[in-house]
From Swiss-Prot:
It catalyses: nicotinate beta-D-ribonucleotide + ATP + H(+) = deamido-NAD(+) + diphosphate. InterPro entries: Cyt_trans-like, NadD/NMNAT, Rossmann-like_a/b/a_fold. Keywords: ATP-binding, NAD, Nucleotide-binding, Nucleotidyltransferase, Pyridine nucleotide biosynthesis, Transferase. GO terms for biological process: NAD biosynthetic process. The keyword Nucleotidyltransferase applies. GO terms for molecular function: ATP binding; nicotinate-nucleotide adenylyltransferase activity. Pathway: Cofactor biosynthesis; NAD(+) biosynthesis; deamido-NAD(+) from nicotinate D-ribonucleotide: step 1/1. It is an enzyme of class 2 (transferase). Its EC number is 2.7.7.18. This is Probable nicotinate-nucleotide adenylyltransferase. It holds the Pfam family CTP_transf_like. The keyword Membrane does not apply.
Length: 212
């Protein structure tokens, strides 16, 4: 089974997270996507909703969408959410499956700063979401890694055994949506219906999340 993994603060989860994940799922013919809320993001000091509330919002989204599942292993952890530790745990949970860790190009270009970043390739494939026509600049520190590990969708279709260590780039539709923008709109009394799944908006309104 091919399993995609998308982590994030999801404060709140919105179409800017969901639509690219759906496009990756379709492009790589993934069997399912694990949506994984962070508990203690290494690069962020605070969130605007509780871990329990963010878990519930993601759980409701997964119930509404086919092929999406909540993964709460980082949310249950009392230590920073280092990706290498998470992938080690997921590799034990899914020993016979092929893992695809999904990130944006903005994260990939800084991958060398991540904790034990080279070990990520020993545990999973990396999927880099990029806007159509975007390319990593020549001479960028991650250019060598991308060139050495880059795999095509055609190669994926011909592989029968689970593999890791490859990098797949997937063109995704631009999403001009951010959690910060959504929180600001809600704080001003605006309802960002086009940015949120109905179940998420309903939960936010019932819980009075992000309202001033």
């Amino acid at each position: 089974m091919r399993i995609g993994i998308l982590g994030g603060t999801f404060d709140p989860i919105h179409y800017g997270h969901i639509r690219p994940a759906m496009e990756v799922k379709a492009s790589l013919k993934l069997d399912k996507i694990l949506l994984m809320p962070n508990h203690i993001p290494p690069h962020k000091n605070t969130t605007h909703s509780s871990t329990a509330q963010r878990l519930e919002m993601v759980a409701q989204v997964c119930e509404a969408l086919t092929g999406f599942e909540l993964c709460d292993i980082e949310a249950k952890r009392d230590s920073p959410s280092y990706t290498v530790v998470t992938l080690q745990q997921l590799s034990r949970l899914y020993p016979d499956d092929e893992l695809f860790f999904i990130m944006g190009m903005d994260s990939f270009i800084h991958l060398q700063s991540w904790h034990k970043w080279l070990q990520l390739f020993e545990l999973a494939n990396i999927v880099v979401c990029q806007r159509p026509g975007w390319h990593l600049a020549e001479g960028h520190p991650m250019q060598h890694e991308l060139s050495a590990r880059h795999a095509t969708l055609e190669a994926l279709s011909h592989s029968s055994e689970p593999q890791h260590g490859r990098i797949f780039t997937v063109d995704i539709s631009p999403q001009d949506i951010s959690s910060t923008q959504i929180r600001s709109q809600l704080a001003m009394g605006e309802i960002p219906q086009d940015a949120l799944l109905p179940v998420t908006l309903n939960y936010i309104q019932k819980q009075r999340l992000y309202f001033s």
